[in-house]
Design a protein with these regions (language model features):
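Acidic, glycine-rich flexible loop/linker segments
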Residues: 1-106, 110-130
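Conserved alpha/beta-domain cores
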Residues: 70-282
Length: 282
């Protein structure tokens, strides 16, 4: 993706993995075309434009274009905060130079997928893991660490720490993991610890996992990583966000569990947000 002049996909939407990563890389991308791979040929010269409204356009051949530069200093400052949505720590220092108020959303899923690759419970309950191939791969990944859990907390804290350091002292709001059960199952060793759901989109995800005995040990690793970032690294600009919280009672349970794991709301100005994404939140 870094080498491509532009990216065109048959499937996906604005929130798909390809679209999100393309935006972070500053790459021109059109997703969800349906049949681009059938209509375009290898070696064909085309021009891809994402500057003409909500729909991207693909033109035959190489077209010329004009570049218009805008002096941001003449525009003044907005009354509201303008913050970025970022996931890739490697892009943090590039975007930290932008005139923004911080990061409004950093998703942990990308860091877990790319830097860790293993299911949290496959690490904390490694001795229970039945998949021999997954065990071998996890052994290889964690060979340089004192234990399986520190592999998770060190890698996750480094990813978040890189983002927070780049933007310090501006806020970086980190959303705790929001994998759906089918996505958790795709992590190394994950299938053993995840139920098969008919509709994972509204299933065992978000806040409901954090205090549940079936995943509580995994959430403990996430909390420890965030504690390391805030306390050991001193990056207290990190705020935390809880996704898919269905009820007030559920939110209170999560707050209690986070305090149990060293993240007390209000301590050292720790702020804990809820992501407003389902009707009951409103």
């Amino acid at each position: 993706m870094k080498r491509a002049s532009a990216i065109i996909t048959n499937g996906g939407g604005r929130t798909s993995h390809a679209a999100i990563v393309a935006r972070e890389l500053g790459a021109v991308a059109i997703v969800g075309t349906g049949d681009a791979t059938e209509k375009l040929e290898d070696g064909q010269e085309i021009t891809v434009s994402c500057a003409e409204g909500n729909e991207g356009k693909v033109y035959e051949g190489k077209l010329e274009w004009d570049t218009e530069e805008i002096d941001l200093e003449e525009m003044g400052d907005p009354d509201t905060q303008v913050m970025l949505i970022l996931a890739n720590p490697k892009m943090a220092y590039k975007y930290a130079s932008y005139p923004v108020d911080g990061v409004g959303l950093m998703r942990l899923e990308f860091a877990i997928n790319n830097a860790i690759k293993a299911h949290p419970l496959a690490l904390s309950r490694f001795d229970e893991l039945e998949d021999e191939e997954a065990k071998r791969k996890i052994e290889d990944l964690t060979a340089a660490y004192p234990d399986k859990e520190s592999y998770f907390t060190e890698n996750l804290s480094q990813a978040v720490g890189a983002m927070a350091a780049a933007f310090y002292p501006r806020e970086v709001i980190v959303r705790m993991s929001d994998f759906k059960t089918n996505e958790y199952a795709d992590l190394l060793g994950g299938k053993q610890f995840e139920p098969k759901e008919e509709n994972p989109m509204v299933g065992f995800r978000g806040a409901s996992r954090y205090y549940n005995e079936r995943y509580k040990d995994g959430f403990k690793l996430e909390c420890e990583a965030m504690r390391i970032v805030r306390e050991d690294m001193g990056l207290d600009n990190v705020k935390l966000m809880i996704p898919f919280c269905r009820t007030v009672d559920e939110g209170k349970k999560v707050i209690e569990v986070m305090e149990e794991y060293g993240l007390k709301q209000g301590k050292d100005n720790l702020e804990i947000y809820v992501m407003c994404e389902i009707p009951s939140n409103v």
